[in-house]
A protein has these predicted regions:
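Loop-to-transmembrane alpha-helix initiation sites
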Residues: 17-20, 66-71, 92, 96, ...
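Structural signature of hydrophobic alpha-helical transmembrane segments
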Residues: 13-25, 61-75, 139-143, 189-203
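Cytosolic-side transmembrane-helix boundaries in multi-pass membrane proteins
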Residues: 245-252, 256-283
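Short loop segments and helix-boundary regions at transmembrane helix junctions
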Residues: 33-115, 212-223, 242-243
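Transmembrane helix-bundle core of multi-pass membrane transporters
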Residues: 2-16, 87, 94-154, 282-283
Length: 283
């Protein structure tokens, strides 16, 4: 029995996939805490799909896909900030416009050059077949993101929580927003290998949303989100070996199940807890 349970660890490709998914899940969850605080979930969705044209162009010209995806994500984020700053359009309208435009452009590029582009890798990811050079890329991206987040997490918190107060203490909202979107784009690029373009949004939203239901303290929220992201990344890869299912699908399903548990049974915000309090108040 023990040998059966330890079987996935005997394969090098499984070991690589587990540790990469753990790192990606943890860092994406770190950023998801800020998306919850600011109410920017839709931006995470937009960036996760906006990298598709960058990946398609990179594949078409035999360039590192991470390079194309990163620059496409940065371009999308800067476009959102720029259009919002010069127009009277609401934020959700700008995000929806950029998201649909970039995604449509990506599909167009794929349709024009289908033979050179592995659509399945873009959509579903390919963590079990990840090459060593891609592992190094992801590891470097995650390390840089982690270091920058640990250095600037308090400044980002102030910018997201009270922009006016941040300006009075000498912080530049534009600089920190660009920094955040750069980090988010980098994490989306890394997560593409793990779960693919379609499910990236779950990794940058669900852990933060789950933690948001469990605590009112932001520092604790970050810790819970990172733990959930890392653990589901590791366990998801492990379980996918036995389920013979898509790794990204298993990871996101685990995150969704944990969210549903928090949604129902969170001590303060859970649906069951709220109904119990109403019954007590009524009595």
């Amino acid at each position: 029995m023990l040998e059966y349970l330890l079987e996935p660890f005997s394969y090098e490709y499984m070991q690589k996939a587990m540790w990469i998914s753990t790192a990606v899940g943890g860092i994406c969850a770190f950023l998801s805490a800020y998306l919850m605080l600011k109410g920017w979930s839709l931006i995470g969705d937009a960036l996760s799909h906006s990298v598709v044209p960058g990946v398609a162009i990179a594949y078409a010209f035999s360039l590192p896909y991470a390079l194309g995806a990163f620059f496409a994500g940065i371009l999308a984020a800067l476009s959102i900030l720029w259009i919002k700053s010069i127009s009277k359009l609401k934020e959700d309208a700008v995000i929806g416009f950029i998201f649909s435009t970039f995604f449509a452009l990506g599909l167009l590029i794929i349709s024009l050059n289908p033979t050179s582009i592995n659509v399945q890798n873009i959509i579903l990811g390919n963590i079990l077949g990840i090459a060593d050079e891609d592992i190094y890329q992801v590891a470097i991206i995650m390390l840089i993101c982690l270091v920058l987040l640990l250095i600037f997490w308090k400044d980002l918190l102030l910018i997201f929580f009270d922009e006016t107060q941040a300006i009075t203490v000498g912080l530049s909202p534009l600089f920190y927003k660009v920094l955040f979107f750069t980090l988010l784009s980098a994490c989306v690029v890394a997560a593409l290998q793990t779960v693919g373009a379609i499910l990236v949004i779950a990794m940058v939203i669900t852990p933060g949303a789950t933690a948001y239901l469990l605590t009112d303290k932001f520092k604790t929220l970050i810790k819970i989100a990172v733990a959930l992201g890392a653990i589901t990344g590791f366990v998801g890869v492990y379980l996918s070996y036995y389920l013979d299912g898509t790794t990204g699908g298993v990871i996101v399903t685990l995150q969704t199940l944990l969210f549903l548990l928090a949604f129902l049974f969170s001590p303060k915000y859970g649906l069951v807890s709220q109904k119990r309090r109403k019954v007590v108040d009524y009595d």
